[in-house]
């Protein structure tokens, strides 16, 4: 079973026991957290798509560690001015392990009109 979660302005496709790096979250290493903004949940062809989120779906995870990304250098130079500026930035991130995906109460994905027409023809 997999889910697509939204956190930190980004979307991640996760499954049980996945370890992912996301934007910084509060909480110490070992704390349990829950993601409730689930965009999609399912297994194979049997997937439920939210509008915008799947109702009642929850992904639980455990904080593994906090860290900082590699340094990104922002360098500005003004030619012929003997002027330059160097800045560095390291973004904070959190490493989490996905424990469980619960899809209870999700809305069913509405079938397309072509699929409905094919089902009617098969029934006749």
Curated annotation (Swiss-Prot):
Keyword Kinase: no
Any Gene Ontology biological process: translation
Keyword Coiled coil: no
Pfam family, one: Ribosomal_L21p
Superkingdom of the source species: Bacteria
Listed GO MF terms: rRNA binding; structural constituent of ribosome
GO cellular component: cytoplasm; ribonucleoprotein complex; ribosome
Quaternary context: Part of the 50S ribosomal subunit. Contacts protein L20.
Function: This protein binds to 23S rRNA in the presence of protein L20.
Family, similarity comment: Belongs to the bacterial ribosomal protein bL21 family.
Protein name in the entry: Large ribosomal subunit protein bL21
